[in-house]
Each structure stands twice: as structure tokens, then as C-alpha cells.
Amino acid sequence: MARVTVEDCIEKVENRFELVLLASHRARLLAAGAPLTVERDRDKNPVVALREIGDETITAEDLKEQLIHSMQKYVEVDEPEAETVPLLSSSPAAAAVAPQSSSDDKNVQFDFMSEEDLLRGLENLAPPTETDDEGE
């Protein structure tokens, strides 16, 4: 029964490898509870899937799209790149500046730090001191 079914399907899906992929995907869908589009006739799910493809009750293109969608684990979304974040200065003059009214917010300027400056600053940081709790 399966050999005749495969021969019928080769006319619909020319590549045997693709036919096997599509039929196995459809068989898994049937096992998961998808509705049948042909009579079962005591056939197992792979044979029913091949018969559905051969009788064109489901299209190979739809099955292919479903298969691709089921295999995708990550969908890449284009997001804009993050803008440079302003650096807060540790100078006494900057510390003296307090939040003011919203009209003054338009005139605020920030200092920017390059990546090299940031790396140099991180290198100059002292390592944290060890405590008794870290040894356990």
C-alpha cells in the first residue's frame, strides 16, 4: 500500500526527500490530533499522510510552511541600536546640580565617554576586598 502511495505522491512532490519530510510532519500532526482529510481505512498515520498528499486534500506548500514554522526556534527582530548613554560626572560641580524645572531640562548638556575611556577607568578600579563569607 505504501509503495503505491509514494508513487502517487512523486507526481505532487518531485523530491523524495522533501516528500518524506512533509509526510512525516503531517503524520506527527495527525498523531497530535489534527483532523483527517481522507478516510483512515485501518492505515497508520504515515500512510494516511501520504494519501492526503497524493489526493491533494492538503497542499504540499502549506505543509512546507507549517514544517518551517514548527522548526523555527528564534525569530530575529530588527531593533534599533542603543544610543550612547550620557556619563554622569563625579565632579563636585556636577554633584551640586539638583533637579530643576522642566524648562531648564532643554539646556542640559552631558559629557560623553568613549569605550576606551571606560575601559581605562575600569582598569583603575581596585578589586573588592575578600571577606570571611566568601571562603565557604
Swiss-Prot record:
It is an enzyme of class 2 (transferase). Pfam families: RNA_pol_Rpb6 (PF01192). Transmembrane segments: none annotated. The keyword Signal does not apply. Its EC number is 2.7.7.6. GO terms for biological process: DNA-templated transcription. It catalyses: RNA(n) + a ribonucleoside 5'-triphosphate = RNA(n+1) + diphosphate. Keywords: DNA-directed RNA polymerase, Nucleotidyltransferase, Transcription, Transferase. One of its GO terms (cellular component) is DNA-directed RNA polymerase complex. The RNAP catalytic core consists of 2 alpha, 1 beta, 1 beta' and 1 omega subunit. When a sigma factor is associated with the core the holoenzyme is formed, which can initiate transcription. HAMAP family: RNApol_bact_RpoZ (MF_00366). This is DNA-directed RNA polymerase subunit omega. It comes from Methylorubrum extorquens (strain PA1).
